[in-house]
Amino acid sequence: MKILWAALVLTLLAGCRADVEPEVEVRETAVWQSGQPWELALSRFWDYLRWVQTLSDQVQEELLSSQVTQELTLLMEDTMKELKAYKSELEKEVGPMAEDTKARLSKELQGAQARLAGDMEEVRNRLSQYRSEVQAMLGQSSEELRARLASHLRKLRKRLQRDAEELQKRLAVYKAGAQEGAERGVSAIRERLGSLMEQGRLQALTSHPLRERAQAWGEQVRGRLEKVGSQARDRLEEVREQMEEVRVKVEEQTEAFQARLKSWFEPMVEDLRRQWAELIEKVQVAVGASTSPPSQKS
């Protein structure tokens, strides 16, 4: 009878486990159904970790060659990069949010992000430790190491899932706060614009006489400017004519002065030229007389 009861209990427990475990898998998969790039990157890390947890022969081989830790490192970096980019996009939208609320939400978000990064780092470190432990066994049985690793990985996956869900919630709150602040900002701007438009309408009604006076004054100023411009053009033309008359007079006086100088100096030049010619002639006569040979006596 006890054997039958024991068999019945084991059957019930096995059935409960068979019913519960698929729900856990479905829940784990459903967590990452959002379309944000950082969540898709984390989903790839999650799926790869689930494959590592099988500890199959291929996993064992790649663990010993450090290929698994290298792949996890790349997936971690990709997740953190996408998460940082998404957070930056949200920070651009939180302008209208109150500063104290913004600081509180940002601090909570940073804490959740740090916990997720720490979980991923611990997974990688634990796998590196396992590789070192297996290599130190020098060919001995490593079943106990694999069992401890499998248990540790299950705990790490649960913690990773919990912290990832917490980060999702913090990001959702942060985004909701940003949207609420933006809506308040838009509402305030809309009210301000409405007030300004009403003020502008009232000012337009009251400023109509002022506009007419301003237009009349503008026409008057424009007429005066045109008159001044016309007078300036006339004056400029008059000055140009006077300058032309002065130029003609200067040229006439210059020509007269040149003619007078010519009348003064030409007689003197002619007289000097004549005297010079006479002097040359006398010198030549004198030189010729002094060089002629004396006459011979018979």
Curated annotation (Swiss-Prot):
Pfam families: Apolipoprotein (PF01442). The modification Methionine sulfoxide is found at M137. GO terms for cellular component: chylomicron; extracellular exosome; high-density lipoprotein particle; low-density lipoprotein particle; multivesicular body, internal vesicle; very-low-density lipoprotein particle. Residues 1-18 form the signal peptide. Transmembrane segments: none annotated. Keywords: Chylomicron, Endosome, Extracellular matrix, Glycoprotein, HDL, Heparin-binding, Lipid transport, Lipid-binding, Oxidation, Phosphoprotein, Repeat, Secreted, Signal, Transport, VLDL. Residues 204-272 are annotated as: Lipid-binding and lipoprotein association. GO terms for molecular function: cholesterol transfer activity; heparin binding; phosphatidylcholine-sterol O-acyltransferase activator activity; phospholipid binding. Residues 152-162 are annotated as: LDL and other lipoprotein receptors binding. Coiled coil: none annotated. APOE exists as multiple glycosylated and sialylated glycoforms within cells and in plasma. The extent of glycosylation and sialylation are tissue and context specific. Glycated in plasma VLDL. Residues 74-244 are annotated as: 8 X 22 AA approximate tandem repeats. Residues 260-272 are annotated as: Specificity for association with VLDL. The modification Phosphoserine is found at S141. It is found in: Secreted; Secreted, Extracellular space; Secreted, Extracellular space, Extracellular matrix; Extracellular vesicle. Heparin binds at L156, R157, K158, R159, G218, E219, Q220, V221, R222, G223, R224, L225. GO terms for biological process: acylglycerol homeostasis; cholesterol efflux; cholesterol metabolic process; lipoprotein metabolic process; melanosome organization; phospholipid efflux. APOE is an apolipoprotein, a protein associating with lipid particles, that mainly functions in lipoprotein-mediated lipid transport between organs via the plasma and interstitial fluids. APOE is a core component of plasma lipoproteins and is involved in their production, conversion and clearance. Apolipoproteins are amphipathic molecules that interact both with lipids of the lipoprotein particle core and the aqueous environment of the plasma. Homotetramer. May interact with ABCA1; functionally associated with ABCA1 in the biogenesis of HDLs. May interact with APP/A4 amyloid-beta peptide; the interaction is extremely stable in vitro but its physiological significance is unclear. May interact with MAPT. May interact with MAP2. In the cerebrospinal fluid, interacts with secreted SORL1. Interacts with PMEL; this allows the loading of PMEL luminal fragment on ILVs to induce fibril nucleation. Belongs to the apolipoprotein A1/A4/E family. This is Apolipoprotein E. The gene is APOE.
